[in-house]
Amino acid sequence: MTVPYYEFLDAGMQVDVASIKGGEIPIDPQSFYYFLITHEDKRFLKDPAFQDKIKNSPSIDDIDFTDYDLIFFVGGWGPSYDFAQSKRLAEKVSAAYYAGTPIMGSVCHGALAFVSAKDTSGKPLVAGRKMTGVTQGQLDFFRIKFTPKHPEEELRKAGADFRANHHPVADIFATVTVVDHEQRFVTGQNQNSGHETAQKMMELLSQRSAK
C-alpha cells in the first residue's frame, strides 16, 4: 500500500484511502519486519496524515468511484478475505468501468477486487482481459494455504487472460505489470510491481488527458 500511495502523492495527486466497511484498516505487523520493510513503509511510520487515513477510512459506500481518476486496490493477505466476496465492491467496480472512468489498478491479491464484477450481460468483467496477480507457484513457495482466495486461480476461473513472469532460479521475485486491451485495468504480479504499476496508471491517465 505504501509504495503506490507515495507514487501518487509525490506526483501531486490527492490520495484518499477507503475500505469496504470503513474504519481502521488492519495492518499486518510482519509488513514492518527488517527484511520486508521498504523505504515507503518507513516513511509511513513517520507520516501522521497517512496514518490517520488508515485509522479513519471511509467505507466504499461513502465514496463515488467515478469521482476519481485512478483507483488502486492494494495487495497483501487482507484482500483475499473480502475483495472477491464483496457484492458491493463488485457493483462499484462495474459501475466505474461503464462510467468510463477511472483507470483501475492493483498488485498481488488486490486483483481479487475485479473477479466478481460483471458486465451488462452478467458475465465476468475480466473475461478475456490481460491481468495478473501473485501466482500460485509464488504462494506455494511460501506454503500459503490459509488465505481463502488466490488471485491466479480466481482470475483464471473468471476467464481472465492471466499473465505472469517466471524466473528459473528466484521465481518468488519474478514480477510483471500488464495492461488490458482497453487500457482500463493495470495489474501488477506482486508487491515488487508497486512502483511500475502506479507509474503506468499515471502514464495512461496523462495520455488520456492529452487527447
What residue ranges belong to the model's regions?
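Extended, subdomain-level signal for the structured scaffold at the beginning of enzyme domains
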Residues: M1-T101, L112-K211
